[in-house]
Amino acid sequence: IFRSPLSAEELRDQISDYHESDIADAFEQLSVEERKKLYPLLGAEWVAEIFSYIEDPDEYLQELNLDQAAKVLSFMDSDDAVDVLDELDDSTQEKLVGMLDEESSHDIKMIQSYEDDEVGSLMTTNFDVIHDTLTIRQAMRELIRQAGENDNISTVYVIDKDNRFYGAIDLKDLIIAREGTLLDDIVSTSYPYVTDHEKIDDCIEQIKDYAEDSIPVLTGEKELIGVITSQDLVEVVDDAMGEDYA
């Protein structure tokens, strides 16, 4: 359908019927010029989602001008954006990061500040967090507000008045909680975590044993700064196995 003589609106509607993974597969069959015509049609947010299914998105990002590329990066999860940027030359990296909004730029620089073998280099800042003083109703409202930006919502993290990690709540427990229930009654204060400067090799088995969708990453002062998802973990294990058999 990418090469069909449809109007821009008709083509966009047709493409929307397909999953982003399928669109990514189709992208690889198109020429550079064909993709360049599609990027403005799809928009930065959609392109960012499609890029998450492409093995080497940095190659496709370089088909965009700097302004377009920065917009796409701003819609990517921070850890994915870092992976893409790390494949670019230093000058291009610096220009793109400088064009991002303050929050995206901060998150990317923070992740890039860690050594490759440290937990912090794997984390994403895409997670939902609420304060332990909220009521059930307030917590649900806050979660709905954050859900538009963060899609890792199966686990909701809780911090105290000093912004230190307090625990976690399963989204299901929050949804079914009666309005009069105290937030403290459904928070798991023994929820596992890792610290940002821990070595990945030292804690990978421990994280696997937890069997959680995501694990919070804390600083030495117990400040919640990110999470490691199960998908991140799978990729690390796969990479390690690939090196072992190389």
Regions found by a protein language model. Give the residues of each.
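Hydrophobic packing positions in regular secondary-structure scaffolds
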Residues: I1-Y245
